[in-house]
Curated annotation (Swiss-Prot):
Residues 298-311, 338-350, 400-417 have a biased composition (Acidic residues). The gene is PPP4R2. Residues 140-149, 158-170, 186-196, 259-269, 385-399 have a biased composition (Polar residues). GO terms for molecular function: protein phosphatase regulator activity; protein-macromolecule adaptor activity. This is Serine/threonine-protein phosphatase 4 regulatory subunit 2. Widely expressed.
């Protein structure tokens, strides 16, 4: 836009007694809404801005009356006139261009784009008005009218006076010093500053030498490692063929194993069938053997019972015979005792007679009678010993027979039970 034409339109608006809408100034507000570029000072277009704002609020109220429903309980209800006066009071108190000038111009030029109700529109205007930061017009900083700005961002135009950046955050923001850009790949000194050209050339030569040495060492390392890791492609092909052959062998071995497993499973099944048959036959044999054993045991039991009965009968018959034998043995014992007593008496009488004969003869007799008497004594002693041994044997036999009878007698009631 032409700044001179804009300034003339603003002067005409102030001179008029009856304020009306000016198309040139409306075009200026549309330009600010699109680009955010304010080419003139705030004091120059402040009056028309307030006039346009008041007119838009009044038109919005007439076209969109207040809603019929109750107000929102979460929001404080403020009447239209009070909200209008508050907004106008804030705007008249500005001494500079608010940094939300672009959004305010959008609301003034197209109010129904985002709002349909009066209350919401007024709250949107109030939110954009209650700010503190200010911006300067682009003409004051750059003295040119060929700058492009969109939403607060500067874009270079055809003017050569455009710098790299423009201060859009207000007058208080300091500008940084223009320092040469340093690439990260360039060598740096210990102080963080770029080195001189001579040192750069020397460093470049050193870097080239290092690169050559590194490349040579890397090639040597690769050549040393290559026989271990990276082999010749022909060898790789041979290895691949070897792997394929091994895979085929493994596949064949797997097939052979499968067939072997199948055959073994069939053999196992046949063996199991044979075992079942053998077990069945062995069971039959066991049954037959059990039957024969049962018959044998029954016959043995019958024979044992018959033998017991016979032994029982014989024992009963033997009891009186044994009693008679015992009686006879007792009689024999008594007879033997009587004979032994008689023999003793005879021996005593013989001894007394021999003594008498010795006394009467007084040693005049020969040794013959003495020897005869001694022989007689020996014979009598032998007879007595034989009789005593016989009697001992008889007693031992009788005691053994008595013990056998007692055991047989004790066994008989057990067998009867």
């Amino acid at each position: 836009m032409d700044v001179e034409r804009l300034q003339e339109a603003l002067k005409d608006f102030e001179k008029r007694g009856k304020k009306e809408v000016c198309p040139v100034l409306d075009q200026f507000l549309c330009h600010v809404a699109k680009t955010g570029e304010t080419m003139i000072q705030w004091s120059q277009f402040k009056g028309y801005f307030i006039f346009k704002l008041e007119k838009v609020m009044d038109d919005f109220r007439t076209s969109a009356p207040e809603p019929r429903g109750p107000p929102n309980p979460n929001v404080e209800y403020i009447p239209f006139d009070e909200m209008k006066e508050r907004i106008l009071k804030i705007v008249t108190g500005f001494n500079g261009i608010p940094f939300t000038i672009q959004r305010l111009c959008e609301l003034l030029t197209d109010p129904r784009r985002n709002y349909t109700g009066t209350d919401k529109f007024l709250r949107g205007v109030e939110k954009n008005v209650m700010v503190v930061s200010c911006v300067y017009p682009s003409s004051e900083k750059n003295n040119s009218n060929s700058l492009n700005r969109m939403n607060g961002v500067m874009f270079p135009g055809n003017s050569p006076s455009y710098t790299e950046r423009s201060n859009i955050n207000g007058p208080g923001t300091p500008r940084p010093l223009n320092r040469p850009k340093v690439s990260l790949s360039a060598p740096m000194t210990t102080n963080g500053l770029p080195e001189s050209t001579d040192s750069k050339e020397a460093n470049l030569q050193q870097n080239e030498e290092k690169n050559h040495s590194d490349s040579s060492t890397s090639e040597s390392e690769v050549s040393s490692v290559s026989p271990l890791k990276n082999k010749h492609p022909d060898e790789d092909a041979v290895e691949a063929e070897g792997h394929e052959v091994k895979r085929l062998r493994f596949d064949k071995e797997g097939e052979v194993r499968e067939t072997a497993s199948q055959t073994t499973s069939s053999e196992i099944s046949s063996v199991m069938v044979g075992e079942t048959e053998a077990s069945s036959s062995s069971q039959d044999k066991d049954k037959d053997s059990r039957c024969t054993r049962q018959h044998c045991t029954e016959e043995d039991e019958e024979e044992d019972e018959e033998e017991e009965e016979e032994s029982f009968m014989t024992s009963r018959e033997m009891i009186p015979e044994r009693k008679n034998q015992e009686k006879e043995s007792d009689d024999a014992l008594t007879v033997n005792e009587e004979t032994s007593e008689e023999n003793n008496q005879m021996e005593e009488s013989d001894v007394s007679q021999a003594e008498k004969d010795l006394l009467h003869s007084e040693g005049s007799e020969n040794e013959g009678p003495v020897s005869s008497s001694s022989s007689d004594c020996r014979e009598t002693e032998e007879l007595v010993g034989s009789n005593s041994s016989k009697t001992g044997e008889i007693l031992s036999e009788s005691s053994m027979e008595n013990d056998d009878e007692a055991t047989e007698v004790t066994d008989e009631p057990m067998e009867q039970d």
